[in-house]
C-alpha cells in the first residue's frame, strides 16, 4: 500500500463512490472507531500537535486545570505548560508534585474554567508517598460541573501488556471506556506506526477540533496516512499486530528466542577470528526507551565484548557498520543487546583491527 501511494495516483481527498471531493481523514477514521469504539477521530502530524489543537479548540483564553505532578516534559525540552501557553490557554495547576486529590480540582474550578486535563506520565514515574486522581474520578467530576475531560496518553497503546506478564499500561480503549471526552496519543512509539497525533473521543468535540484553522497547518500527509492505515489494519487481529509490528515483537519476544539470537550472533562474531577480542553471552536488562514504559525491565541476552580496544572505539565502529548496530557500555564493557537486532544486522559485522 505504502509504495503504491508513493508511486501512483491516490484518492487522498477524492470520493471514488460519489465522484467528488472527499476527506483525507476518512481513510483512518473508520478503522480507529472500529478498533477503539470511539465516537469520532482525527489524525494530525504528531501528538504535540494533537494536544495543541485540542487545547486551543476547547479552552482558548480559558483555564485548564491539571495536576502539578503531570506537567511533563517530552523529548527536545517540549513541556506541557509551554504547549498550553501557545494554545492560548491559562494553566491552572493543582495539588503537589507527589499528591493531588479530587478536591484540588474541584476547589480550583471557576467560571473561567473550560477543561479538566489529565496527562499520562509515559516517560517517568513517581513512587513512594503518592496520590493521584483516576480518570474515572475526574470524569465523574467533569459531569457534575459540566466540564469536558481530556486525557493525553502520550505513547498510547491498543494492547494490554499485562496479559503477557508485563506491567500494566493504560490502553486507549480503557481510557475511552472510562468516559473521557478527548484522548490524544502518538501514532508511533508503542503503537508502532509512523509519527502522527491521534485524537479520539466524543463527536461534538472532535467536530469542533476539525473546524479549527490549525487543523490545516497540522494536517497529516498522504504517505503518513498510508503507513498509519496499514498499521491500524493489523490491530484488527492482536496476534497479527504482535507478529508484524517491530515494537510489539521486540517487547514481547520470548526469552528462548532471545537466547537463540544471542547464540547466532556469538557464532557470527567468532567466525571473524579476531585475535584481540573475547565474546561472552550474558543475561541483561533491556529498556523500551522512546518515552514509554519508563520503569519496565525486560530480561534479555547480550554479547559482552572484551578487547584491547576501548569500548568507545568498538561502539563507534559498530555505529558505522552497514547497517549500524547500536550498543551500550556497562561497567566498562561493550554490550550488544540482541533484542532489537534484525536478521540483516548480522550480515556484515565490522570491528576495529588497528589502533
Where are these regions (language model features)?
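Conserved C-terminal alpha-helix-loop-beta "cap" of PLP-dependent enzymes
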Residues: 255, 259-342
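Short coil/turn segments at secondary-structure boundaries
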Residues: 12-18, 240-244, 330-332
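Conserved PLP-enzyme active-site core in the AAT-like
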Residues: 16-235, 270
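Active-site cofactor/substrate anionic-group-binding motifs, chiefly glycine-
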Residues: 3-23
Amino acid at each position: 500500500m505504502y509504495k503504491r501511494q508513493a508511486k501512483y495516483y491516490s484518492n487522498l481527498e477524492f470520493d471514488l463512490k460519489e465522484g467528488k471531493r472527499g476527506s483525507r481523514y476518512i481513510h483512518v477514521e473508520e478503522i480507529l472507531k472500529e478498533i477503539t469504539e470511539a465516537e469520532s477521530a482525527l489524525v494530525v502530524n504528531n501528538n504535540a500537535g494533537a494536544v495543541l489543537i485540542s487545547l486551543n479548540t476547547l479552552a482558548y483564553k480559558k483555564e485548564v486545570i491539571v495536576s502539578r505532578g503531570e506537567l511533563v516534559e517530552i523529548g527536545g525540552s517540549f513541556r506541557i505548560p509551554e504547549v498550553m501557553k501557545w494554545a492560548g490557554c491559562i494553566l491552572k495547576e493543582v495539588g503537589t508534585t507527589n499528591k493531588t486529590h479530587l478536591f484540588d480540582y474541584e476547589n480550583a474550578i471557576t467560571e473561567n474554567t473550560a477543561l479538566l486535563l489529565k496527562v499520562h506520565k509515559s516517560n517517568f514515574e513517581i513512587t513512594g508517598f503518592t496520590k493521584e486522581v483516576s480518570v474515572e474520578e475526574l470524569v465523574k467530576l467533569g459531569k457534575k460541573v459540566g466540564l469536558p475531560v481530556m486525557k493525553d496518553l502520550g505513547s498510547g497503546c491498543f494492547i494490554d501488556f499485562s496479559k503477557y506478564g508485563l506491567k500494566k499500561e493504560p490502553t486507549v480503549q480503557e481510557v475511552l471506556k472510562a468516559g473521557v471526552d478527548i484522548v490524544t496519543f502518538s501514532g508511533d512509539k508503542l503503537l508502532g506506526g509512523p509519527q502522527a497525533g491521534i485524537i479520539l473521543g466524543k463527536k461534538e468535540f472532535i467536530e469542533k477540533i476539525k473546524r479549527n484553522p490549525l487543523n490545516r497547518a497540522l494536517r497529516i500527509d498522504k504517505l503518513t496516512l498510508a503507513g498509519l492505515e496499514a498499521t491500524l489494519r493489523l490491530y484488527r487481529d492482536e496476534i497479527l499486530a504482535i507478529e508484524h509490528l517491530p515494537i510489539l515483537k521486540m517487547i514481547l519476544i520470548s526469552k528462548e528466542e532471545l537466547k537463540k539470537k544471542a547464540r547466532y550472533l556469538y557464532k557470527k562474531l567468532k567466525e571473524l577470528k579476531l585475535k584481540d577480542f573475547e565474546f561472552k553471552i550474558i543475561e541483561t536488562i533491556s529498556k523500551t526507551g522512546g518515552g514509554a514504559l519508563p520503569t519496565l525491565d525486560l530480561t534479555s541476552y547480550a554479547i559482552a565484548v572484551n578487547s584491547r580496544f576501548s569500548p568507545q572505539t568498538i561502539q563507534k565502529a559498530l555505529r558505522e557498520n552497514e547497517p549500524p548496530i547500536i550498543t551500550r557500555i556497562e561497567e566498562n564493557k561493550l554490550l550488544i543487546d540482541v533484542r532489537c537486532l534484525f536478521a540483516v544486522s548480522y550480515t556484515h559485522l565490522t570491528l576495529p583491527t588497528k589502533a
